[in-house]
C-alpha cells in the first residue's frame, strides 16, 4: 500500500493504515512524506515554540519553509517565548507563521482581568487556546504535533498517525527520548529556549507554568497542584464551539 492508496480524511482506518505502513520511517523522512506526498498544501505544523519545539521547526524548514506554522498567541505567554518565536522564524527562514488568537469579545466577557486560569483553568485553555486553534486548522486535512511518549502517562500511547474527526494528527517525535531531542539540538547547532536552563523542561502560559525539580515528570510544572495535565487540544477532536 502506498500513501496514495489511502483516502486521507481523518478516519481511524486511514490513521491505522498509515501507522502500519510508516511506523519504521524516521522523523525527518516522515515529515517530508506528510508535507510533500500525503497532504501537499493541506497540512500545518502547530508549534508552541516551547522547550524542544526547535527540533520540529528545523525539520519542517528543511523540507519546506513555506509550510504553515500555527502559533496560538494566548495573550499569556512568557516574554521569552515570544522573543524565541521571532528568533527561530528568522533563523530558520520560516515564511508562513499563522497567528491564532482568542476571540476578543469572548475574552473581554469571560476573562477581562486575566485571572480565569485560577478559577477555571479548563475554560481558560478553551477560550485562549483550544478554540483559536480549532478555527486556525479549519482548512487543513492534517496537522503535525510535537508530542512525545515520555512526557506524561497520557501521552505514553500516542501513535505516529492519529485520527481526529475529519483530520489526521501526525506525531513524528512520539518515539523520541529527552536525550534524542538534546542531541539533535546540539548537533544542528540550534538555540535552546532560554527558560530550559532555568528549570522549565515544559513551557506553556506564564500563569500556569512553574519550574520542575530534578526527577519530576517533565510536565509536572504545568498546572501544578491540579489534576489537569493537558490544555485540551489533544483530549477531544478540535471543533469550533466545543465545550471541554
Label for each model-derived stretch:
Residues 2-244:
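Nucleotide-activated chemistry modules centered on ATP-dependent adenylation/adenylyltransferase
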